[in-house]
UniProtKB/Swiss-Prot annotation:
InterPro entries: Chorismate_synth, Chorismate_synth_AroC_sf, Chorismate_synthase_CS. This is Chorismate synthase. It comes from Polaromonas sp. (strain JS666 / ATCC BAA-500). Homotetramer. One of its GO terms (cellular component) is cytosol. It comes from the Bacteria. The gene is aroC.
Amino acid sequence: MSGSTFGNLFAVTNFGESHGPAIGCVIDGCPPGLALTEADIQTDLDRRRPGTSRHVTQRNEPDAVEILSGVYEGKTTGTPICLLIRNTDQRSKDYGNILETFRPGHADYSYLHKYGRRDPRGGGRASARLTAPMVAAGAVAKKWLAEKYGTSFRGCMAQIGDIAIPFESWEHVPRNPFFAPVADVSHLEDYMDALRKAGDSCGARIRVTASGVPVGLGEPLFDKLDADIAFAMMGINAVKGVEIGAGFASVTQRGTTHGDSLSPEGFLSNNAGGVLGGISTGQDLEVSIAIKPTSSIITPRQSIDTAGNPAEVVTKGRHDPCVGIRATPIAEAMLALVVMEHALRQRAQNADVTVSTPDIMRARG
C-alpha cells in the first residue's frame, strides 16, 4: 500500500534511504533452483554505480551486494531473497543549508506535505540511489529469463541534452561512460564538461530493448504488458515520458505504414514495439524513456522556506549533471522485472495452451 513493492508473483520490496546505513530489497516469488551468486548481481550494479567517471556524481559507493537469505548451496530456495547494499560514502553535512528550504524540481515540497516530515539528506527515499536495489533484483530476473527462454536485455543512450546520438553498434555501448552506441564520444564529453562548469544539468533519452521474449506475455485491458512497462519506467526517478515502439511518431504515420505486416519468416517491421493488444508478439520489446534534467544544481534558484517566505536555493554536494548517464542499466532492470512478472503469470495460467499457428519469431530464430 505504501508504494514500495513492485510486482505480485515476482514481488520486489525496496527499502532504505540515500544516507541511511543501507539500501536493499526483498524478492518474494523467485522460482527455486536458480543458480545465483553475488557475482551474478554485481555485474549490473557496477554498471550503475556512482563515481565511475567525471561525468557522474563523485559519491564513491562500491555498491557491493550481499545475499542475506533465499539462497542455499548456491541455488535459490523459493523463499524470500534479501539483497543488501551498504551505504559507505554519505556526506550529509552537504545538505545543512537546505534543511528549511525546498529545492526546485525536487520532491522536498511534496514529501513534506504528504508525510509531515522529510529527510533532506540526498533526497531520502526520493533519491535515485534507491534504483540500485531494483537493478539488483533485475539481475536475478534477467538470469532466470535467460536460462528459461533465452531472453536478453540491453540499452543505450539515444540523446543527451540537445545532442541526438545516432545508433552505430551495440558493441560501442560498454566502451564509454555514456552507454552511447557510437565509437567517438568526445563531443559528449565536451558537452558535459561545459555543462558542469556552468553549474547546470541536462536530460536524456534512453533506449532499452528485450530480445527473445516469448509470445503471449501480458493480459487484456488493465494488465497489458505495455501498460506495465510504462508503469515500471515511470517508477524510475526523473523519468517524465515513455514510448513503446514507434511511440509518438505513430501520430504522423498512416495505417499502411504503422501496422506491422506478417510473413512466414516473421514480422516485417516493429512499430508496435513487440506488443499487440497488450500481449507480446515475440518481437523485440522496444522502449524509450525521457529523463528530466537533474534537480540538484549549484546555480542559485528562487524558492521558499518551510514558513513560506521567499528564499534562494543553491544545492551543494555531489550530484549527477545528467542522471540519464547511469539510467541504462536501471531501465534494463525494470523491463526485466516486468517480463519476469508476466512470464510467471503466463506459466501459472496458460502453461498448457497450444496453438496450431506457428510462432513465426521463434521459427525464424
